[in-house]
C-alpha cells in the first residue's frame, strides 16, 4: 500500500474534484493520502468523511504560500494535520486576497492578448477557492490557443 503526502484538488489548482481524488487513491491502492491544497483547508472535513467511506486514511493539510525574502523567491510550506487549523486562517486569508488581486490583473492581461472571456476562465475555476494560472491555461486550451498545460503559454503567464 502506498502513501501520497502532497495532493491538490479542485479546491485549489488541481483539476480533479475531491471525491474523485479519494476514489482514485482507493482504486490505485493508496492507503494514506494527504490533501494539501494551496492556501485552503476547505476540503479537509469532507476529505476525512470520504476517506472513511473509501477506506483511505486522510491526512488533512494545507500548502501555505510564502515568500523567501533572502532569496527573493517563493516558498511553499506543507502543513500536515494542524492541531488548530483556525489559527492558519488569517495567514491563508491574506494570501488568498493577494492571489486574487494578482490573478485579476493576469486575467485582464490574458483577455487583452486572447479573445477569451472571464466566464470561460471562471468555468474552469469552478469549485476552487481562487483562480490559478492552470484555470486560465485550461480556458486557453479550450479555445485552441495553447496545446499543453505547462508549455510556452504557461511560462508567459
Residue ranges and their predicted role:
Residues 52-157:
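Extended substrate/RNA-proximal surfaces in nucleic-acid metabolism proteins
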Residues 1-74:
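An N-terminally biased module of ancient metal coordination in phosphate/nucleic-acid-related enzymes
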Amino acid at each position: 500500500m502506498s502513501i501520497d503526502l502532497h495532493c491538490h484538488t479542485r479546491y485549489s489548482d488541481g483539476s480533479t474534484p475531491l471525491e474523485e481524488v479519494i476514489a482514485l487513491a482507493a482504486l490505485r491502492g493508496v492507503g494514506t493520502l494527504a490533501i494539501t491544497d494551496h492556501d485552503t483547508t476547505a476540503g479537509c472535513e469532507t476529505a476525512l468523511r470520504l476517506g472513511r467511506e473509501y477506506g483511505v486514511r486522510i491526512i488533512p493539510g494545507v500548502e501555505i504560500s510564502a515568500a523567501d525574502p533572502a532569496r527573493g523567491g517563493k516558498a511553499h510550506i506543507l502543513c500536515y494535520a494542524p492541531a488548530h487549523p483556525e489559527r492558519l486562517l488569517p495567514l491563508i486569508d491574506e494570501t488568498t486576497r493577494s492571489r486574487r488581486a494578482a490573478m485579476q490583473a493576469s486575467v485582464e492581461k490574458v483577455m487583452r492578448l486572447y479573445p477569451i472571456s472571464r466566464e470561460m476562465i471562471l468555468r474552469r475555476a469552478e469549485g476552487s477557492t481562487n483562480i490559478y494560472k492552470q484555470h486560465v491555461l485550461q480556458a486557453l486550451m479550450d479555445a485552441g490557443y495553447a496545446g499543453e498545460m505547462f508549455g510556452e503559454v504557461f511560462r508567459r503567464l
